[in-house]
Design a protein with these regions (language model features):
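Cysteine-centered functional microenvironments
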Residues: 17-24, 29-31, 83-94, 156-163, ...
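Condensing-enzyme catalytic core mediating Claisen C-C bond formation in acyl metabolism
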Residues: 71-135, 139, 146, 204-205, ...
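Buried hydrophobic packing segments
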Residues: 13, 17, 39, 100-105, ...
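Internal helix-turn-beta structural module
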Residues: 152, 173-183, 188-226, 230-231
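Active-site pocket-lining segment
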Residues: 12-15, 58, 121-190
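Flexible glycine-/small-residue-enriched beta->alpha junction loops
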Residues: 1-16
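N-terminal extracellular/periplasmic Venus flytrap/periplasmic-binding protein-like
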Residues: 20, 26-111, 121, 174, ...
């Protein structure tokens, strides 16, 4: 009631970010294509098998679209603003899903012979303007890096939730992240963004990637509706 101007769709926040950072439709589509290509390759290699539990016969993410290209994306209508740049193809799809992780003390894990994937170093949250909701990971990641006494260059693996291509690109730019380190097996634009599951999914994925790639530090970060962000830095135990 007191702030009616703040009631808008997440898609409009993506358009706001695209305008603020002067991101073209093609730039966003390039990012979406990359996410789909990485997810397609990871799926063909069986990289997701360790991470997926079959439910009612479903054992594969349905959002992956191997044939995504510029021509296909060019045909899509603008989803939120007729004068904007964001389409369904550059947004994370609505998907059903669930994720779980086990967080415990190291002693408990060892006493119970549990496979330790990684160690949590620090986590941080931050707020931003609600109309620029997707920028939340910037401040949250900066806080987490400072608490961990690390720089972005020290981070080997980044799992950045792809709510929209525009906000992902903005976060990558402001955090100065090496694109080669981001979402190695694709992100939410290809895999989906089931509400309530994303934090566990990307953090668990980051831990799995540290082991697979034999790296030391990973950053898992996501935006949150109404103008928040969260970031977690984890360390390999290998």
């Amino acid at each position: 009631k007191n702030n009616p101007h703040l009631y808008f769709s997440m898609g409009i926040t993506a358009e706001n970010v695209a305008k603020k950072y002067q991101l073209t439709r093609k730039e966003q589509q390039d990012f979406a294509i990359s996410s789909q290509q990485k997810a397609t390759e990871a799926d063909s290699k069986g990289n997701f098998k360790k991470e997926i539990t079959t439910v009612n016969g479903c054992s594969r993410d349905e959002g992956i679209r191997p044939n995504t290209n510029q021509e296909v994306l060019d045909k899509l209508k603008l989803a939120f603003d007729e004068s904007g740049t964001v389409t369904a193809g550059t947004s994370s799809p609505l998907t059903d899903g669930a994720a779980t992780t086990l967080i415990c003390e190291e002693k408990f894990a060892k006493d119970n012979n549990l496979d330790i994937l990684a160690r949590i170093i620090t986590t941080s949250v931050d707020g931003c303007e609600p109309e620029l909701m997707g920028l939340g990971p910037i401040g949250a990641s900066q806080k987490a890096l400072k608490r961990a006494n690390l720089s972005i260059e020290d981070i080997d693996i980044v799992e950045l939730n792809e709510a929209f291509a525009s906000q992902s690109l903005a976060c990558i730019r402001d955090l100065n992240i090496d694109r080669k380190k981001i979402n190695l097996d694709g992100g939410a634009i290809a895999l989906g963004h089931p509400l309530g599951a994303t934090g566990a999914r990307i953090t668990g994925k980051a831990a799995e990637l540290l082991r697979r790639e034999n790296k030391k530090y990973a950053l898992a970060t996501q935006c949150i509706g109404w103008g928040m962000g969260i970031a977690t830095i984890i360390e390999s135990t290998n």
